[in-house]
Amino acid sequence: MYHSFNIAVIIPCYNEQKAIAKVINDFKTNIPTASIYVFDNNSTDSTAQVAEDAGATVHSVPLKGKGNVVRRMFSDVDADIYLMVDGDDTYDASSAPEMINHLIKNQLDMVVGCRQENGDQNTYRKGHR
């Protein structure tokens, strides 16, 4: 259903070199028609290079803070549908097509996903409940 839409997966990042390639590849697998954008916020590791090597379009955001990055993402990327995910592999990319189809089918402005509580201590990091 979503294949005729311009979909952008936008990923704010700071020091996510260990997880970013998996995140990019998972979303490329689950939404093959989407464009993947990584917005690096002054990482001191190789996040930007790893993301580029994985096939993402990488933007550098020099102003510190996730708020600055989010504003830049929505300003710099033109798409019909935006899917914003974190670069630390905490969201299941296989849920994305269902969420996008739900958005389109029901003519919604926004759909918000959330990790499910499953008893796993790693579901939510401390301070993220």
UniProtKB/Swiss-Prot annotation:
PANTHER family reported in the protein's UniProt record: RFBJ PROTEIN, UNDECAPRENYL-PHOSPHATE 4-DEOXY-4-FORMAMIDO-L-ARABINOSE TRANSFERASE-RELATED
Name of the protein: Protein RfbJ
Annotated metabolic or biological route of this protein: Bacterial outer membrane biogenesis; lipopolysaccharide biosynthesis
Lineage per the UniProt record: Bacteria, Pseudomonadati, Pseudomonadota, Gammaproteobacteria, Enterobacterales
InterPro entries per record: Glyco_trans_2-like, Glycosyltransferase_2, Nucleotide-diphossugar_trans
Superkingdom of origin organism: Bacteria
Entry keywords, A to Z: Glycosyltransferase, Lipopolysaccharide biosynthesis, Transferase
GO terms for biological process, alphabetical: lipopolysaccharide biosynthetic process
Signal peptide coordinates: none
